[in-house]
Amino acid sequence: MAGKPTLHYFNGRGRMECIRWLLAAAGVEFEEKFIEKPEDLDKLKNDGSLMFQQVPMVEIDGMKLVQTRAILNYIATKYNLYGKDMKERALIDMYSEGVADLGEMIMHFPLCPPAEKDAKLTLIREKTTNRYLPAFENVLKSHGQDYLVGNKLSRADIHLVELLYYVEELDPSLLANFPLLKALKARVSNIPAVKKFLQPGSQRKPPTDEKKIEEARKVFKF
């Protein structure tokens, strides 16, 4: 029997958190090896573990996978969270990319210079309420089903619900006009494996604060 997947990243959200969410939702236990200093990253680079000299990296099924989308695709396929045919996978990809676009803006927000934060937050709010959330609300409204694609839980639902938690952290009022998305969030959050991941003490990471940013700066030298 194969061992648990091992996740190599720093002890924060960043680009690994969507991978943690997907594994947790699939009910897969995983281990984490945190990169705590530049030497830890250098060791992974020097031993050939990082194809493109960067993390996230996940050891799974005898492979050392890098590139977030490749990792997510593999996990989603392995654990049957990627639709039943090509058309469903195309929709799942399209929705997941939309989630990633807004998620990227939110992920970079804590790195904003203080003078730019208000303008950035205004932009995120505008994109959230006028572009991204209405699009996903309309998908659910158009077919009246419980999940985005094929009336079955997929990676798109998991990525979207993760994003909704981040939106709520920024400003809970942003979800007010999207009842179907709030219902999806509640539905996915009540899946036993996800419910467990949302409990205190799980491997879910807290919001990024100044301390985490400084830790990441030291490791990744940005």
Swiss-Prot record:
GO cellular component, one term: cytosol
Domain GST C-terminal stretches: 85-208
EC code: 2.5.1.18, 1.11.1.-, 5.3.3.-
List of residues that carry N-acetylalanine: 2
Residue spans crossing the bilayer: none
Pfam family, one: GST_C
An individual GO BP term: glutathione metabolic process
InterPro entries xrefs: Glutathione-S-Trfase_C-like (IPR010987), Glutathione-S-Trfase_C_sf (IPR036282), Glutathione_S-Trfase (IPR040079), Glutathione_S-Trfase_N (IPR004045), GST_alpha (IPR003080), GST_C (IPR004046), GST_superfamily (IPR050213), Thioredoxin-like_sf (IPR036249)
Molecular-function GO term, any one: glutathione transferase activity
Predominant location: cytoplasm
Keyword Hydrolase carried by entry: no
Tissue: Expressed in corpus luteum, adrenal gland, testis, liver, lung, thyroid and kidney.
Residues where N-acetylmethionine is found: 1
Keywords: Acetylation, Cytoplasm, Isomerase, Lipid metabolism, Oxidoreductase, Peroxidase, Transferase
Protein's cellular compartments: Cytoplasm
GST N-terminal domain: residues covered: 3-83
Keyword Magnesium: no
Annotated catalysed reactions: RX + glutathione = an S-substituted glutathione + a halide anion + H(+); prostaglandin A2 + glutathione = prostaglandin A2-S-(R)-glutathione; prostaglandin J2 + glutathione = prostaglandin J2-S-(R)-glutathione; (13S)-hydroperoxy-(9Z,11E)-octadecadienoate + 2 glutathione = (13S)-hydroxy-(9Z,11E)-octadecadienoate + glutathione disulfide + H2O
Residues recorded with modification N6-succinyllysine: 4
Subunit text: Homodimer or heterodimer of GSTA1 and GSTA2.
Family, similarity comment: Belongs to the GST superfamily. Alpha family.
Function field: Glutathione S-transferase that catalyzes the nucleophilic attack of the sulfur atom of glutathione on the electrophilic groups of a wide range of exogenous and endogenous compounds. Involved in the formation of glutathione conjugates of both prostaglandin A2 (PGA2) and prostaglandin J2 (PGJ2). It also catalyzes the isomerization of D5-androstene-3,17-dione (AD) into D4-androstene-3,17-dione and may therefore play an important role in hormone biosynthesis.
Protein name per the record: Glutathione S-transferase A1
Source organism of the structure: Bos taurus
Taxonomic classification: Eukaryota, Metazoa, Chordata, Craniata, Vertebrata
